[in-house]
A protein has these predicted regions:
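Short, conserved acidic/polar surface loops in the N-terminal third of protein domains
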Residues: 90-95, 143-145
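Short acidic-hydrophobic, aromatic-tinged amphipathic segments that line or gate anion-handling sites
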Residues: 29-31, 133, 337-342
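A charged helix-plus-loop insertion that forms the helical arch/lid used to bind
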Residues: 93-109
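Divalent-metal (Mg2+/Mn2+/Ca2+)-assisted nucleotide/phosphate chemistry catalytic cores
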Residues: 24, 104-105, 109-112, 116-227, ...
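Conserved nucleotide- and phosphate/pyrophosphate-binding catalytic cores
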Residues: 215-409
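N-terminal catalytic cores of NTP/NDP-binding nucleotidyl/phosphoryl-transfer enzymes
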Residues: 31-93, 199-205, 211
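Positively charged, low-complexity intrinsically disordered leader regions
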Residues: 2-46
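Short, hinge-like loop/turn segments at secondary-structure boundaries
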Residues: 96-101, 149-152, 242-243
Length: 409
């Protein structure tokens, strides 16, 4: 099945292909050399990145993969953004010690409503070589006999090789049958779209390789897999929605800038590599300057401006930097984000504004003493979860809010 009218003319520039194969790349299957040969052959490849719509926004972790798609798009290759409208209702067990809650079709539809706009911040949606698809379009049509035919291409022992399943068995935890089927149905996406390649984070390697296996068995065709490095904090924890340290693509420019500035210095170089378009040679120069003893804050300011510009444009990034400088050089924040409770809990109100990613993050910030009432200069405790008095607050180092108890105060 082809979703593109005709192959595009592709660019085979050695330097651009070299950067494509190395920047942010953990591993290529079967090999980087085999993929390089394809890229130099002037063949127009079709590749995809899949997103399970488990939340209403996208974050920098998604941006890492979208930036890689943009590199392929700029070379003339066809790229597909695949929504997991079907697989999101199963729930990806990747990295989970327990089963994910299954989403309803209505929840999935609501979550994807803003995705295209956010993805358009990184991909060029005006070009003909980008498509948006949803796996519910074919997976919802599968009959029981079709499902059995697909599932018969895999063995139980293959699926049990997953690290998280081994861990659950070791701990005596349940593994549900629908979780076994997740990589099977995701693999079927690649076969249905007849793609040449899939891009994703290296935590998705098992799922992506399942697609490679199914492609060989059903179509006798090679499917390349590009596993990308993950954006992780110094403890190795992935930056994302579930982890409570998310930089959302829907965040305001000042919030994006402030959140990046709160990153530890150890994330500066990997942040440049994964989340910006700064050339690799320039990143090497930045690394050398750090080794010579340059103040990391100077580089982090540039990183924050680069990432904010990627999401919101250069003009908004400059304004965000000016606001940051005013807040932390002069001690006067230029703006407070307005938060109106209207009877809602503070956690819900803050999540709606993308100030925090989850109630877990808010609880962690309170435990760390990272939320301060600026009117009384007091740190907030657990009681803030239930009763958040109107006033001005600092959350962490770089987020400022003004809480209104009602629409009249």
């Amino acid at each position: 099945m082809s979703f593109f009218r005709k192959p595009q003319k592709v660019i085979t520039d050695d330097a651009k292909i070299r950067e494509l194969l190395t920047r942010g790349v953990e591993r290529v299957y079967p090999t980087a050399g085999a993929l390089e040969k394809e890229l130099l052959s002037e063949k127009c490849l079709t590749l995809y990145f899949g997103i399970d719509p488990t939340g209403p926004t996208l974050h920098l972790g998604h941006a890492v993969c979208l930036l890689k798609l943009r590199q392929f798009q700029d070379l003339g290759h066809n790229v597909i953004v695949l929504y997991g409208g079907f697989t999101a209702q199963i729930g990806d067990p990747t990295g989970k010690g327990e089963a994910r809650p299954q989403l309803s079709a209505a929840a999935v539809k609501k979550n994807t409503s803003n995705y295209r706009k956010l993805i358009g911040k990184i991909l060029d949606l005006k070009k003909a070589n980008v498509k948006f698809l949803d796996n519910k379009e074919w997976s919802n049509k599968l009959k029981p006999a079709d499902m059995m035919a697909i599932a018969s291409r895999f063995t139980v022992s293959q699926v049990l090789e997953r690290d998280m399943f081994k861990e659950r068995q070791k701990n005596g935890q349940e593994i549900y049958l629908h979780e076994f089927l997740y990589p099977v149905f995701q693999a079927y996406d690649a076969v249905t779209m007849d793609v040449d390649m899939q891009v994703g984070g290296n935590d998705q390697t098992f799922n992506m390789l399942a697609g490679r296996t199914l492609m060989r068995k059903m179509k006798n065709k090679e499917k390349f897999v590009m596993a990308l490095k993950l954006l992780v904090d110094p403890t190795g924890k992935k930056m994302g929605k579930t982890e409570g340290n998310m930089v959302a693509l829907s965040d305001t420019p000042s919030d994006v800038f402030g959140k990046i500035m709160s990153w530890p210095d150890s994330m500066i170089l990997i942040g440049f590599e994964l989340c910006t378009k700064v050339p690799l040679n320039d990143i090497e120069a930045l690394k050398a300057s750090l080794e010579r003893g340059e103040n990391p804050k100077h580089l982090k300011l540039r990183l924050a401006e680069e990432i904010t510009a990627l999401i919101h444009g250069g003009s908004e990034a400059k304004k965000a930097r000016s606001g940051f400088d005013a807040a932390f050089t002069e001690g006067k924040p230029q703006e407070f984000m307005e938060v109106r409770l209207f009877g809602k809990e503070i956690a819900e109100a803050l999540m709606e504004k993308n100030i925090i990613a989850s109630k877990t993050e808010l609880r962690r910030l309170l435990c760390e003493g990272a939320i301060t009432n600026l009117d009384s200069n007091t740190k907030m405790g657990e009681e803030f979860l239930k009763t958040a008095p109107p006033g001005k607050y600092r959350i962490g180092k770089h987020r400022f809010i003004k809480i209104h108890g009602s629409d009249t105060d």
